[in-house]
Amino acid sequence: MKELDHRDLIEEAEPLAPGLIHEIRHPLMGILAGLELLARRIPAVSSTQEWQLLNEQAARIDELLRTYQDLFAGGPVERLPFPVDQTVRRAVSLLSPRIRKLGARFSLEAGPAPAVAVGAAPLLVHAITNLLANALDAVEERGTPGGRVQVRVLRPPGRVQVRVSDEGTGIAEAIRPHLFQPRFTTKPPGKGTGLGLHLARTAIERSGGELHLVDAEDPARASWARTEFAISLPSSGGAQR
């Protein structure tokens, strides 16, 4: 039998992804239905933090799987005005168990006024959670006490930006040109597929935006950041549908 390395396995499995996603959603629908039935039979349970967490995370898995289905299908994406601040907070909340461990070393800066962009909110959630999970991984991997992670919402003219910065391991110059290539990963086998950044950029581009690694010379970059990514979307004021 042909021996496959980790990258070969990912490449061979990729065409099966839409079918696998479909199969995973079947038992997930059963979990969501069971949670709803439990809340109906025992109304008090739906007010507990444990039930709310289970329901929210199961719904998030379903949303994530549907997002992946849409990405693999390659069909048109409806672009509508949506509140970026609210969407960013949703993405952050999905990683709250990991973020809580950072305490004051994590910060979210959304600005004084609501920012409204044009695009697909679920795709932005997908991209932010990917970037934020990578940032948390980098800080944990570095292991230096005091490593920070920050999410900011900026408003350059005609755009809305979401920036994810971290004080983790950093990214070597030699690998930066390959970051968004499919199946490229710096993580050990079993820790990463090499599809995360590729799919995050694909999601943002299909939403009408851009995703890039921020240069050290960028004046808006966090001065302490070892790595910073920026998502840019048209603002609702000057965007074209």
Language model region names:
Residues R100, R105-A115:
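Conserved catalytic submotifs in the C-terminal HATPase_c
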Residues D166:
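Acidic ATP/Mg2+-coordinating residue in the GHKL
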Residues I171-R183:
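Short conserved segment of the HATPase_c
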Residues T48-R98:
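Conserved DHp (HisKA) dimerization/phosphotransfer helix of two-component histidine kinases, i.e.
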